[in-house]
Amino acid sequence: MPRVKGERRLEILKALAQMLEQPKWGKITTAALAEKLDVSEAALYRHFASKAQMYEGLIEFIENSVFTLSNKIAQDETDGRKQASKLVEMLLAFAEKNPGMVRVMTGDALVGEHERLQARMNQFY
């Protein structure tokens, strides 16, 4: 059965996020990511021009998820204190559900990667 367009790309991002969840992983190499997926490094680069683009994919997921939930909270709750409380709860729940993404959000996973990644994550805050 043929793959749905973008399916492999999503698999790559999920594998990268899973690797980021493991404390033993420092800087993740494309070789290690390819090995986890049982594909060649060249296969990774058919879907992403660079490792930086893979991290950008994770950042886009973070932005889309958090901003969508934040906007819903802002629409549903008019009291500022309750909004703030719900925003904190949402961020903590997101972090608990996506521990690998926390390393991206804090910049830990981006150390030694392209500077634009850290700059983009800084804009998030």
Model-assigned labels for residue ranges:
Residues M1-P23, K27-K36, Q53-E56, S65:
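Basic, helix-initiating cap at the start of DNA-binding domains
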Residues V4, Q22, R46-H47, D76, ...:
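Histidine kinase transmitter module recognition
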Residues R9-L10, T30, A52, E56, ...:
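Short, structured helix-loop boundary elements
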Residues D38-F48:
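Short hydrophobic/aromatic patch on the recognition helix
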Residues G57, N71-K97:
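Hydrophobic alpha-helical connector segments
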Residues N64-F67, N71, E115-Y125:
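Amphipathic alpha-helical packing segments from all-alpha helical-bundle domains
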Residues E96-R116:
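Amphipathic alpha-helical segments used for helix-helix packing
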